[in-house]
Amino acid sequence: MPTRDKLPPCPDPERYTLTRTREGEYWRLKKRLKKPAVLNNRLQGNTELGKKSSSAGSRIYSALHPFLADLEPRRIFHKMITLLRNGFRHDGRLDVSVLRELDLQKDYPLRKLIRSGFQWQHDKENHVFRFRIQIPERNGALLRQDRQMSSYRFIIILVHGNPEQEATMQTSSVKSGEYPFAGTGTIDECQLELSYTPEPGQWLFCLRAECLAAGKVAAHPRSRALLILDGGRWD
């Protein structure tokens, strides 16, 4: 730092001011002329990104709440926000497809509950989602974890709308009949269809499986699961 004896002439009186310290004096650029710190801009950008992701995640979570209320999602909401934020970073806009194959109950995922393979289809031409699963002759398509569990069923769920706007998310669902764990003596198949009217916005297609005891959903969270099968955008 230059001392008083070696202090050079002021580069530009309009832009610089003399600063005195114990070590000496020097010309400093006036504060109003300094460029904003790149780090501050980055932090502000991350803050805005976090707000957008959190708001979108809250709206999606609220739309799914009727099917989430009896689960133990733990920190799945934070996982959802993280995935949405990464989607924003990738191309600068919200993309719910990053939630594809997200199990909404980490400790009791669908793969641990379901015993039969299933298929699903998005028929874009006819605007319908289809789901099918084979029902075994004996036992069940779901894992019976308690003797009090007598039957089980499936629910397909469609959430659609604009997660970036208030009060635009809609939810529709189709529920199967009940299938006894004891079996019916014949091989059966559960087939569900959910029709929709495509509107600009985004969608999530989900599957919930649940075990029943005395006609009600069994008490323990391990008796049910919810999985986001796919997601996308209708332009």
Roles of regions detected by a PLM:
Residues L83-G231:
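Charged linear interaction tracts used for macromolecular binding and regulation
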Residues K6-C10, G45-N46, K52, R59, ...:
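C-terminal tail/extension regions appended to the core domain(s) of diverse proteins
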Residues M1-L113:
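Long, polar/Ser/Thr-enriched low-complexity segments
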